[in-house]
Amino acid sequence: MSTVVVDAVEHVVRGIVDNPDDVRVDLVISRRGRTVEVHVHPDDLGKVIGRGGRTATALRKLVAGIGGRGIRVDVVDTDQ
């Protein structure tokens, strides 16, 4: 199930950004649970988050629909 979630998020994010080759989606399993980390080119960060966080919220709803509750989605700021 987890690879389906990662593949779906990667497919959607690659369709949104201007630099699809710089997209990387990882599944991190820790004590806090499962987290899907989305890494994009710094110029595309705003597109993935969206106005008022709408795109990021839609990604979270997509993940909840595919993988069930308990999987977090984090858009990682690669500038830091």
UniProtKB/Swiss-Prot annotation:
Keywords: Cytoplasm, RNA-binding. Residues 33-80 form the KH domain. It is found in: Cytoplasm. It comes from the Bacteria. One of its GO terms (cellular component) is cytoplasm. GO terms for molecular function: RNA binding. Disulfide bonds: none annotated. It holds the Pfam family KH_KhpA-B. The keyword Translocase does not apply. Belongs to the KhpA RNA-binding protein family. HAMAP family: KhpA. A probable RNA-binding protein. This is RNA-binding protein KhpA. The lineage of its organism: Bacteria, Bacillati, Actinomycetota, Actinomycetes, Mycobacteriales.
